From Swiss-Prot:
Region (Disordered) location: 269-292
Chain's role: Mediates digestion of the cell walls of the 2 mating type gametes during mating as a necessary prelude to cell fusion. This enzyme acts specifically on the framework proteins (inner wall) of the cell wall, cleaving several model peptides at specific sites.
Gene Ontology molecular-function annotations: metalloendopeptidase activity; zinc ion binding
Protein's name according to its UniProt entry: Autolysin
């Protein structure tokens, strides 16, 4: 069944087709079938929040955050597959590729397609694309996308005036040909990243704010990102090394900053030989339509940096950057820089390309990145470069390359201020390491090992991964020690009483939820683990909900910060989960009691609630409602 039929229904599809045939020019029905590579990208931006209270007011409003995160959009693009040049050893677009470089879905539609077909960045597909001639009303489409996303996740996507990218081609069908392998989950061997940072220069557009700032030099960016005496404490190397316990390396030998990289403001890519097509010139001057097909008899793709920020412009940036880097190698291949750069360019496993764009570029977002990285290269873009938050923004986008989703709290997409994937606005120059679910997701951390096991061992952490099977004889497990997250990598307790066991394929009750309990300490050492954590979460046990697993092909799960204590929302040292109805011995609730906290650990008791609200079984010798009282000791039984 085609994607169009799935989305709109057979009757609607036939009606739309009939209307198109009646009214559209001949080229509106042009279809392209070929082999392409899929990329899912995530964007966010900063905005100024509204005043704390509207004017006029006699006293100034209270101090507030100067900027807040805004969700921008998720975008699904089809690009040419990457291959390796047999002469140079560099990655390149497959010269046999005949698919356009195009956005095919945005917003909720992009997520739906990705999740339904389990698409990972770098997957190679056989696709049939139909050119889109008339874009939908962008404000209506954006509203529908926001509504669908809110319904799917339960989170509020803060309103934004930015339009969703308009798909340039409609995805009619797809079939997976080659799936990329998972590469971003730690499996016992440190991941040594190769990274090139490109400082981009769009001064050819002759517009203010489109040149690379004179103060933004390769030397400055290198100093900002690598460990050194003059580096900010949240430099990228320190971020990766500290938060991953050195499981991910940002080695100076595999890192370079290049630029400024000049890019022609307007240009095009010569098409390969193919049957003639009706002409489709670039839009007229002043046109607001940014995303009609860029393919015609003159160009296989064209771009205009002064007006647009589509897949075509992004590919123009990347082509110019790669050509710039390769030219440096060609000029002096035997120099230390030439050899180092050539080695990075020829690396075939998840090379990171970070693009620092001029602040005036025609993009609505502040940061934009590939979500997951399995192809030879993956990209992260930042618009502008601020000494205040540049490293936080870049780390956020870099962790999208790792496959991490946003860290939320309740209905707020970026509401978790304990994770760089959430609200990092108050982290300043400190490190804000990922929360427990995200640390587990990429293999940087795991549940606690059995007492007595030394830190940083290969033990799996299965001892602290609790299911219904752990509570069969006694509902209480007392005296569990949760180490501070920065002290060792087995540092969380995971509880899912709706699961029979942790075994693959084990029975689970409908609605089963895993809860992650972790302990965070604000590090007062500059550049130390969690040195960017706010005092709100210092010496706190955090409770997150997360049902994801360690797989890059399991989509749709985001961590959700529920509460933190000892002083939980219950105004006590106790947190209680919602109750899940019993089914085949699975389900119930979870109660967490914080007994003590220190500078290095928290001690907690955990109980499985089998009777909701009050004790009903008064002669079984079990504290079924987890109030600490059994049978006749419980007032419920008196």
């Amino acid at each position: 069944m085609s994607l169009a039929t799935r989305r709109f229904g057979a009757a609607a599809a036939l009606l739309v087709a009939a209307c198109v045939l009646c009214t559209a020019p001949a080229w509106a029905q042009n279809e392209t079938t070929g082999t392409g590579m899929v990329k899912t990208k995530s964007a966010f931006r900063w905005i100024r929040p509204p005043p704390a209270r509207p004017p006029p007011f006699r006293r100034p409003p209270p101090a507030q955050t100067p900027y807040v995160h805004k969700v921008e959009y998720t975008e699904l693009q089809i690009l040419c597959p990457q291959t390796i040049d047999s002469v140079t050893g560099y990655p390149m677009d497959d010269p046999r590729c005949n698919v356009p470089r195009a956005t095919v879905a945005a917003g909720e539609e992009a997520l739906t397609i990705r999740n339904e077909f389990e698409l990972l960045n770098g997957d190679v597909l056989n696709v049939t694309l139909e050119e889109v001639d008339t874009p939908e009303n962008p404000s209506r489409r954006r509203l529908l996308s926001i509504i669908r996303e809110e319904q799917r996740t339960g989170r509020v996507l803060l309103a934004t005036s930015a339009e969703l990218p308009t798909p340039t081609f409609r995805l009619k069908s797809l079939k997976s040909i080659l799936k990329g392998s998972q590469k971003e989950i730690y499996a016992g061997k440190p991941i040594d990243l190769r990274t090139i940072v490109y400082i981009m220069d769009f001064s050819s557009c002759k517009l203010s704010g489109w040149s690379a700032p004179a103060t933004l030099t390769p030397e400055k960016v290198t100093s900002d990102m690598l460990r050194g005496a003059s580096a900010p404490t949240n430099n990228l190397a320190n971020y990766y090394g500290a938060c991953s316990y050195e499981k991910t390396l940002f080695n100076p030998d595999n890192f370079l900053v290049l630029g400024p990289v000049p890019v022609p403001c307007i240009g095009g890519v010569t098409p390969p030989p193919r049957p003639p097509r009706p002409p489709r010139p670039p839009p007229r001057a002043g046109s607001t339509i940014s995303s009609l097909s860029r393919r015609n008899d003159t160009y296989d793709d064209w771009w205009d940096l002064s007006k647009y920020c589509t897949a075509s412009e992004q590919q123009a940036w990347e082509r110019a950057a790669e050509a710039y880097a390769q030219a440096i190698v060609a000029q002096d291949p035997n120099s230390a820089t030439g050899k180092k750069l050539q080695g990075i360019l020829q690396w075939r496993e998840r090379r990171r390309n970070i693009y620092i764009l001029p602040p005036g570029v025609k993009c609505s977002w502040s940061g934009y990145a590939d979500v997951t990285c399995t192809s030879a290269t993956c990209s992260a873009y930042v618009r502008g470069y601020s000494d205040t938050n540049a490293m936080q923004v870049i780390m956020h986008e870099a962790m999208h390359n790792y496959g991490l989703e946003h860290a939320g709290r309740g209905t707020l997409e970026y509401g978790d201020a304990t994770d760089v994937m959430g609200d990092f606005n108050k982290a300043g120059k400190g490190l804000l390491c990922p929360n427990a679910p995200n640390m587990y997701r990429i293999g940087w951390a795991k549940p606690i090992n059995e007492p007595g096991v030394a830190p940083f061992q290969n033990a799996t952490g299965a001892w602290g991964n609790l299911t219904a099977a752990n509570f069969t004889t006694d509902p209480w497990i007392r005296g569990l020690v949760i180490p501070a997250q920065g002290t060792r990598d087995d540092n969380m307790i995971v509880v899912n009483v709706g699961a029979q066991s942790t075994r693959d394929g084990a029975m689970k009750a409908t609605g089963a939820q895993a809860y992650y309990f972790s302990y965070r300490i604000k590090n007062t050492t500059a550049g130390g683990y969690d040195s960017g954590l706010t005092l709100d979460f210092h010496k706190k046990v955090l409770v997150h909900a997360y049902n994801g697993i360690q797989s890059e092909r399991v989509f749709g799960f985001k961590s959700n910060l529920l509460d933190w204590g000892p002083n939980f929302q219950s105004r006590s040292n106790t947190w209680t989960s919602p109750f899940l109805a019993y089914n085949n011995g699975l389900g119930g609730g979870v109660r967490l009691v914080v007994q003590s906290t220190s500078d290095t650990q928290a001690v907690v008791d955990i109980c499985r609630i089998s009777e909701n609200g009050k004790e009903l079984s008064c002669d079984d010798g079990i504290d079924n409602d987890c109030d600490g009282l059994q049978d006749n000791e419980d007032p419920d039984c008196q």
